[in-house]
Amino acid sequence: MTLFILTETSAGYALLKAKDKKLLKRDDLEKETQTAEGVSNLLKLKNFQKFDSATTALEEVASLVEGKVTPRLASLLESIKDEKKVSLAVADPKLGNAIGKLPGLSIQAIADSTTADLYRAIRAHLPTLIPGLLPTDMSTMALGLSHSLARHKLKFSPDKIDTMIVQAIALLDDLDKELNTYAMRVKEWYGWHFPEMAKILNDNMAYAKVVLKMGMRSNSDSADLSEILPEEIEGAVKAAANRSMGTDISNEDLENIQCLAEQVVGFAEYRQQLASYLTARMTAIAPNLTALVGELVGARLIAHAGSLVNLSKSPASTIQILGAEKALFRALKTKHDTPKYGLIYHASLIGQATGKNKGKMARVLAAKAAIGLRVDALAEWEKDADGNEPTEEERAALGMESRYYLEKKLAAMEGKPLKPRGVGIAPNGIPIEQPKKWDIKEARKHNPDADGLTGDEPAATENVSKKSKKDKKLVEEIKDEEMKDAPESEEEEEASEAEESEEEKPKKSKKKESKTSKGKDSDEAKIEELAEKAGLSVKRYLRKLERGEINFDEDGNPTAISKKELKKAKKEAKKAEKDAGKKRKRDEDEEPAESKSEKKKKKKSKA
């Protein structure tokens, strides 16, 4: 089988033919290819197709990087079409697969580790294999092609589109800070002239527009604010302007305030435009991530990771705590619990969870987001039969399904329905209330009639709600009547149940049991009498009798031992035990001493 070697250079395509068909199987291939003579003895040039210009060289190399066969390369391969049993050595496996799929060419592409040494030798001694090619020309052409290829990659790389998201979210955060600072400065500055307007208007944008439209507060009657404010608030602003307590300002002061107000209005309008641009970018680049966590949280995750591809390579555990690196390393250093969430904490699904469920939802949401990110970054969408590209809904189908699953899981964990999408959720799980509509309320007046009241007499202008609460009918509490015939103890209840169940027994057994029941009744009567004498209930009397806390006189009258007497008896018993223990120790200490003296006497007697 004839062996050909395809070599891609910065000057053009070179097709080399091996003089030995079993060149790749030789053991001494590395030794023979160390010199230019050895390489020229093993290989010879079959065909060389030169690039016409630098632009064509860039197009050819860019397509080769993607593993595509260009028409120029296909025409070069047609020169070996007539030869039988051809094998072609290729440096890139992707390119080898593409060449093997070409119609009309029965070429076996080889792209494995056996060709690495051969290609290394060809690159080192390429000028000797291609006549008319100088080493200096090769280096200059390679340098120019590498620069143009780098520019091409930076310009048209799909991975770099997410840089727009990174810059947009960073600018959005900066705009929020600047807008808040400028709006507060306008309120403080214009507040010297018209301080009441800051309490009426909560919206910074509306405040700045009113400053631009009205100017001095003396122009409030002639100024038309209907385009900016509703009728009620417009009337309140004009009424407050007529009775304002602010100081007068000069025209020069007003011009500077209005210039700052123009900046606030311009920044606010641009911020809205930037937010809509960011939403459109996120739905186009990462639709599944946007469906799961929202465009703002998704954009912050991408910006923190650096790019969409870097974020898609991260596992779910990293996505979960992304943005909480300081807390993580602090916890690892101090051997405390690691954080459960980072930037993902601001997602609406986690915001609606409460307590321990926040950590669970963060873990599940990060797992689903990791899957959606890999689809967004690495999936290749093909056109349908009609040639139409997939819609945004089709691309975001996985994210929508995952969100539906997470919403069901969260509702099951929380045991309550979720808030609709679009509702702002605070970190504590409560929806963020929008600023309420400003209403004019009458000031509370002093009630002179209430000054002369004495005691708990109500005021003349008391609220109706308070009266209604006081006028509620009281519910009478009926005390439970004590049943005279009811059994006082569990024993009596059992006896009564036994009597009811045993009515069906024969008469003889009834007579016997009636005697025993009479005996029991007489004993219970005696116990009740003794309990009354002791001044205790029957239950307490029985308990104390079991503990031995009741003494009987000579006449048989019981007396309960008090708590003080019990404490004294216990203390005396403890002292007696301690004294007995000390005596035992003394006896034990004396016994060995006596045994020693006896041993000494025995020794003396033996001697």
Swiss-Prot record:
Q: Does the keyword Nucleus apply?
A: yes
Locate the compositionally biased regions of type Basic and acidic residues.
473-487, 514-532
For the keyword Ribonucleoprotein, the answer is yes
What sequence ranges are listed for the domain Nop?
285-415
What this chain does, per the entry, is described as: Required for pre-18S rRNA processing. May bind microtubules.
Q: Where in the cell is it found?
A: Nucleus, Nucleolus
Please name every pair of cysteines joined by a disulfide bond in this record. none
The GO molecular function terms of this record are: snoRNA binding
InterPro entries in the record: Nop56/Nop58 (IPR045056), NOP58/56_N (IPR012974), Nop_C (IPR042239), Nop_dom (IPR002687), Nop_dom_sf (IPR036070), NOSIC (IPR012976)
Q: What is its main location?
A: nucleus
List the keywords (alphabetical): Nucleus, Ribonucleoprotein, Ribosome biogenesis, rRNA processing
- Bias (Acidic residues) occurs at 488-503
* Gene symbol of the encoding locus: NOP58
GO BP of this protein: rRNA processing
Q: Where is the composition biased (Basic residues)?
A: 598-607
Q: Which Gene3D superfamilies match?
A: 1.10.287.4070, Nop domain (1.10.246.90)
Per its UniProt record, what PROSITE patterns does this chain match?
Answer: NOP
Disordered as annotated region, ranges: 419-438, 446-607
Transmembrane segment boundaries? none
Q: Name one GO cellular component term.
A: nucleolus
The text of the family note is: Belongs to the NOP5/NOP56 family.
Kindly provide the name given to this protein in its UniProt entry: Nucleolar protein 58
